[in-house]
Amino acid sequence: MSSDIPQVPRPLNRRLRAFAFDPILSRSIDMYEINEVTIELPWEETLQAGPVDDYIEVVDVDPASRAFYAPADLNHAYLLAQDGYPPSEGNPQFHQQMVYAVVRTTIGHFEQALGRRALWSPRLVLTGDGWEDVFVERLRVYPHALREANAYYSPAKKALLFGYFAASPAGGGLNLPGETVFACLSHDIVAHETTHALLDGLHRRFIEPSNVDVWALHEAFADIVALFQHFTYPEVLRDQIARTQGRLEDQNLLGELAYQFGQAIGRYGALRSALGAYDETGTWHRTQPDPQAIGRTSEPHARG
């Protein structure tokens, strides 16, 4: 009998835990089970602490706090054995894992649709011969870049920058007044901003506001990708279909974006919704089609 140890095959996927929506939903006894999902990503042999791979580089510097958080090493044996860090609002390494998992998931959906690898828009560099395109290997991701209620893609930095802020006392729902809300822990916000970067890589001129609809296209496309990503998690889909009895035109989480963020800045519900909105009394109403609305709207998010 041979005493040789059989070779262990390389895994196909890396499993990482993340929030399906926002951390706040895990406080609800009837929502916490579907709000924590396990994302499967293609196995990367060269993944470095950060995480850093062939597509993105997570850099966790916090300028407002003058802090730099230790990079997550997702190759640690203990983390591999338990699908990464458990979801946590207070652990910076989970924040790094969360943005990495959602950014890579969004990239994967783009590549599946396009049938090719995704590329970032090149960096324009002024040389003695004029402006030249310089290849951008990795998109940088900063989970704690801003101490404000904001998140955005920077075409100049080729980076995603996420903020954190204190929840408004006027906000409702499960937020506590003054608690810290992290944009990097919102699945919707991360997917939305990643889409801006991917769309810029597909067509760099779409980042230039040559007319009122260019930025609106960016915002609409990013919202649609974030919304459709909800439908890729079977447990979430089953739950919301059951709660609405199949009437997905009624209020449900599948049609809403950035639920916690919206409440934290003082709104009754999500930051944006594809289905309806709350009035001044806090009552939700389904949005009625209005062909004239586009003529009254110029702000990119609302127009998109």
Predicted regions and their residues:
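Glycine-rich, mobile lid/loop segments that gate access to catalytic sites or pores
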Residues: 194
